[in-house]
C-alpha cells in the first residue's frame, strides 16, 4: 500500500478515524448499527476499507477464524463487528496504520495518546432505572432527603409544609413526624457517629434533634437570612451551614458555638459539603462558582469558575476524592486535591438541575426542574438514560420538578423528593442486559470529555 495516496492534514480527521473504530467496538453486541452512526460510517468508508486491508496484509495480524472485512458498510452490524478483535490488536494496528498514511507532521505520540485516551473513556454499561414506589404524606414540596447512614433502614424528608417525616425504607410507611420549624425545611443531615439529625430552614435557624427521643435538643443562631444547606463533618464534631446571607458557618455541634465563618461568595450559597481532608469544605453558589475552603486558615483554597450560571447542586463521590457540580445545562466533575476539572458531562439541554447524587457504582443522577431524571456514567460523562418522572393525579404542570435526591447505602435504590409533594423510590431493572437495554447511544464526538 502506497502511504502517499491518502494524506490527512489535521487532527480532526484523525479523531474521526479513531471514532469509527471505537464505534465498532462500542456497538459490537448490537444486531443493527444505529442510523446516525450508519451515515457517519459512510463518510469514512474508504478509510475504513484501507484500514481493514492493512490489517489483513500485516504480518503481525493473527486473528482466528473468518477474517471479516469492511469492503462495504453493512446494515447488519453484527457481521462487521466481528472485524473488531481485541483492544490490544486495535491498539497495534490502528497506531501502525495511522503512522503509515497520515502526514508525518502529525506527531505519533500525540495520535497514539489521543486514541488511548478515547478508548479509556468508553462508558461502562449500567442497568436502567425504573420507578418502584410512590410515597405520599407531605402537604408541600419535598425539598430535602437523607438516608439512615448506619443501618440503611429508614430515610427522612423535609418539606415546604415545615415538617420532617421519617419513613421506613423497605415498606414506605411513615414512622414519625418531626415539627419545630416555622418555615420551609431546606436541608437535613443525619450523623453516623451520634444519634443526631440536623435541619435548616428558611426561618434562619439550625436545629439538632435527638433521634432516640425525637425532640429538639439544640438551636444554633447566627445566620441573618434563610439557611439552605447543612453538612456534617465526617471526622470532627462540626457542622457546616450556609444560605441566603452568602456565608458559611462552622459550628461545634456540642456547644452551639460558631467556630469560624467563611466569607467569599458573592451570592446566596446553595449547597455545602464537608470532607475529611483539605479542602474540608466545598460550597456552590448563585454567583456561578464552586469554592474549595481551607478551614484551618479560614480562607478559600481555590475558586472554580467554569460554570456560567447559578450552581444549584453538588455531590461528593462515595469512593473517589472528587465532586460533581451542576448549573443549567452543565454538569462537571472535579478532583478535590487540586480542584482540577475531570469530566464534562453530556448535559446539554437538560435545563435547570436541582439535585445530584452519585453511588459507588459510578452512576451519577441529575434531577431537573422539568421533571426529567438523567443518569450518567460518572467516569466517561455519558448520559445512558433519561426518563420523565411520573406525574401525580391533580398536580400542576409547574409541579413536575425533581428537587432533591439520595442513593441508599447500597447504591441500589434512589430516593427523590418532588414538587408534586411526593417521594419516589427508583430501582435498577435487575432483568436488563446489555443486549436488551443498551441505553442511549454513545457518540465519542459529543461534549462529554474526561480530562
Curated annotation (Swiss-Prot):
Q: Is the keyword Manganese in the record?
A: no
According to its UniProt entry, the function of this protein is described as: Involved in pre-mRNA splicing. May also be required for cell cycle progression at G2/M.
Q: Name one GO biological process term.
A: mRNA splicing, via spliceosome
Its quaternary organisation is:
Belongs to the CWC complex (or CEF1-associated complex), a spliceosome subcomplex composed of the U2, U5 and U6 snRNAs and at least BUD13, BUD31, BRR2, CDC40, CEF1, CLF1, CUS1, CWC2, CWC15, CWC21, CWC22, CWC23, CWC24, CWC25, CWC27, ECM2, HSH155, IST3, ISY1, LEA1, MSL1, NTC20, PRP8, PRP9, PRP11, PRP19, PRP21, PRP22, PRP45, PRP46, SLU7, SMB1, SMD1, SMD2, SMD3, SMX2, SMX3, SNT309, SNU114, SPP2, SYF1, SYF2, RSE1 and YJU2. Interacts with CEF1, CLF1, NTC20, PRP45 and SYF1.
Q: Which InterPro entries match?
A: G-protein_beta_WD-40_rep (IPR020472), Prp46/PLRG1-like (IPR045241), WD40/YVTN_repeat-like_dom_sf (IPR015943), WD40_repeat_CS (IPR019775), WD40_repeat_dom_sf (IPR036322), WD40_rpt (IPR001680)
Principal cellular location given in the protein's record: cytoplasm
What are the record keywords, sorted? Cytoplasm, mRNA processing, mRNA splicing, Nucleus, Repeat, Spliceosome, WD repeat
Asked if DNA-binding is a keyword of the record, the answer is no
Q: Which SMART domains does the protein's record reference?
A: WD40
Q: Hey, which family's this protein in?
A: Belongs to the WD repeat PRL1/PRL2 family.
Species: Saccharomyces cerevisiae (strain ATCC 204508 / S288c) (Baker's yeast)
Task: Please report the residue spans annotated as repeat (WD).
Answer: 137-168, 180-210, 222-252, 264-294, 306-335, 348-377, 397-427
**Record's GO cellular component terms:** catalytic step 2 spliceosome; cytoplasm; Prp19 complex; spliceosomal complex
Q: What is this protein called?
A: Pre-mRNA-splicing factor PRP46
List the subcellular locations: Cytoplasm; Nucleus
- Note from the entry: Present with 1770 molecules/cell in log phase SD medium.
